[in-house]
From Swiss-Prot:
<comment type="pathway">
    <text>Pyrimidine metabolism; dTMP biosynthesis via salvage pathway; dTMP from thymine: step 1/2.</text>
</comment>
<dbReference type="InterPro" id="IPR017872">
    <property type="entry name" value="Pyrmidine_PPase_CS"/>
</dbReference>
<dbReference type="InterPro" id="IPR013465">
    <property type="entry name" value="Thymidine_Pase"/>
</dbReference>
<dbReference type="Pfam" id="PF00591">
    <property type="entry name" value="Glycos_transf_3"/>
</dbReference>
<dbReference type="Pfam" id="PF07831">
    <property type="entry name" value="PYNP_C"/>
</dbReference>
<keyword id="KW-0808">Transferase</keyword>
<dbReference type="GO" id="GO:0005829">
    <property type="term" value="C:cytosol"/>
</dbReference>
<dbReference type="InterPro" id="IPR035902">
    <property type="entry name" value="Nuc_phospho_transferase"/>
</dbReference>
<dbReference type="InterPro" id="IPR036320">
    <property type="entry name" value="Glycosyl_Trfase_fam3_N_dom_sf"/>
</dbReference>
<protein>
    <recommendedName>
        <fullName>Thymidine phosphorylase</fullName>
        <ecNumber>2.4.2.4</ecNumber>
    </recommendedName>
</protein>
<dbReference type="InterPro" id="IPR036566">
    <property type="entry name" value="PYNP-like_C_sf"/>
</dbReference>
<dbReference type="GO" id="GO:0004645">
    <property type="term" value="F:1,4-alpha-oligoglucan phosphorylase activity"/>
</dbReference>
<dbReference type="GO" id="GO:0009032">
    <property type="term" value="F:thymidine phosphorylase activity"/>
</dbReference>
<dbReference type="InterPro" id="IPR000053">
    <property type="entry name" value="Thymidine/pyrmidine_PPase"/>
</dbReference>
<dbReference type="InterPro" id="IPR000312">
    <property type="entry name" value="Glycosyl_Trfase_fam3"/>
</dbReference>
<dbReference type="InterPro" id="IPR018090">
    <property type="entry name" value="Pyrmidine_PPas_bac/euk"/>
</dbReference>
<dbReference type="GO" id="GO:0006206">
    <property type="term" value="P:pyrimidine nucleobase metabolic process"/>
</dbReference>
Length: 443
């Protein structure tokens, strides 16, 4: 028998907790046997004294097991269950293409995604822009779409990792969100509850990233790769660039449009293509669906070129309640803003740097993101045709096009966009889209 206060005292004094102590405490979070004050105290003790890798694995698996753990064996799937998770960014629409692409190559992708908060967009918010699409289907429908289509992208259900829900809300109110150990457990408990065979983790770096520095992003990526592999899920973490908007746009309906254009081949932003292919190829390799990276990329390009990935996206949308002709006629269904107008820079030169976080917040100000949980969104607003770093900018080249519902909202966003994108006489040095891969062998 353990006492919560003794577990807190032990971590406060900088000692390692046993697996049994961690399991006891996490069970108490779920059953309310542990008070809010005790959870806050342990969170702060971990924040200051950290956890070793064994503790992190124990915390992650205990939180994973605090609710329902999905089981795919009864469905008789004839391929690996694989997924991707991102720490979030601006214009990060990768999931919408990657899920169908991986499914078209023989994987099964039960992707449980989140909503946007702060400056980052949420995958679920993008799907909410599609009329009829159920982001919270019954577990039966979720399983059916995964089996029949190969991919389903939905929101977290109430019975998945309840311990994380309670722990996270308390961390949010007590300034312990930034702990690498606790971030690792929070992210991975949700993913591992999906009983994945393999996971590709996208950890963002730069001005639009969740972590403030490259070093912090790398530390988180290493922690996630080590804990996930330690918990039995083959995982690679990629460090990818978020020093500029990833797609050519940021918002909800506008990102859905870009995803469909990508899948159908109408337009593929080169940076978005590079990161999507890097993550998706890694999923195929980890899942045993490709022999090497060249084979994985060839398979992915094939399902893009022959239309199979776009077809699967359409089947997922209709399977979860959306229009059956959405891919072919998306412009008929996606909402559009009252005002769609370009923004021009005050000076000429090259797009030199971007405060990506501020561009994300400009979308929030337009009504496309949340200031607080529960805020209603306007799915039509956002930015399109956002310039890329290194683009030559003159008086006739817009740095972005703003989609707004009022002149006031447009003016506010215009000011923010001009401030966030710096124009210089000199072109910036080109940075890679993917900085590093952290695989099990690298740990």
């Amino acid at each position: 028998m353990f006492l919560a206060q003794e577990i807190i005292r032990k971590k406060r004094n900088g000692l390692a907790l046993s697996t049994e102590e961690i399991q006891f405490f996490v069970k108490g979070i779920t059953t309310n046997a542990v008070s809010e004050g005790q959870i806050a105290a342990l969170g702060m003790a971990v924040y200051f004294n950290d956890m070793n890798m064994d503790e992190r694995i124990a915390l992650t698996t205990a939180m994973r097991d605090s609710g329902t753990v999905l089981n795919w064996q009864s469905l008789g799937l004839n391929g690996p269950v694989i997924d991707k998770h991102s720490t979030g960014g601006v214009g990060d629409v990768i999931s919408l293409m990657l899920g169908p692409m991986a499914a078209a190559c023989g994987g099964y992708v039960p992707m449980i995604s989140g909503r946007g908060l702060g400056h980052t967009g949420g995958t679920l918010d993008k799907f909410d822009a599609i009329p009829g699409y159920q982001t919270e289907p019954s577990s039966e429908l979720f399983r059916k779409v995964v089996k029949d289509v190969g991919v389903a992208i939905i929101g977290q259900t109430g019975d998945l990792v309840p311990a994380d829900k309670r722990f996270y809300s308390i961390r949010d109110n007590t300034a312990t969100v930034e702990s690498i150990s606790l971030i690792t457990a929070s992210i991975l408990s949700k993913k591992l509850a999906c009983s994945l065979d393999a996971l590709a983790m996208d950890v963002k770096v730069g001005s639009g990233a969740f972590m403030p520095t490259y070093e912090a992003s790398e530390e988180l990526a290493r922690s996630i790769a080590a804990v996930a592999n330690g918990a039995g899920t083959k995982t690679t973490a990629l460090l990818t660039d978020m020093n500029q908007v990833l797609a050519s746009c940021a918002g909800n309906a506008v990102e859905v449009k870009e995803a469909i254009d990508f899948l159908t081949g109408a337009y593929r932003n080169p940076r978005l293509y590079a990161v999507t292919m890097g993550l998706c190829a890694e999923m195929l390799l980890l899942g045993g669906l490709a022999t090497d990276e060249a084979d994985a990329r060839a398979k992915l390009n094939r399902v893009l070129d022959n239309g199979r990935a776009a077809e699967i996206f359409g089947k997922m949308v209709s399977g979860l309640g959306g229009p059956v002709d959405f891919v072919e006629n998306y412009s008929k269904y996606l909402p559009q803003s009252q005002i769609i107008r370009p923004v021009f820079a005050d000076t000429q030169g090259y797009a030199h740097s971007m405060d990506t976080r501020e561009l994300g917040l400009a979308v929030v100000t337009l009504g496309g993101g949340r200031r607080k949980p529960g805020d209603a969104l306007d799915y039509s607003v956002g930015l399109t045709q956002v310039c890329a770093l290194g683009d030559k900018i003159d008086a006739s080249t817009p740095i972005a096009v703003i989609h707004a519902q009022s002149e006031d909202a447009f003016a506010q966003a215009e000011e923010a966009v001009k401030k966030a994108i710096r124009i210089d006489e000199v072109a910036p040095e080109k940075t890679p889209e993917i900085y590093a891969y952290i695989r099990a062998a690298d740990l």
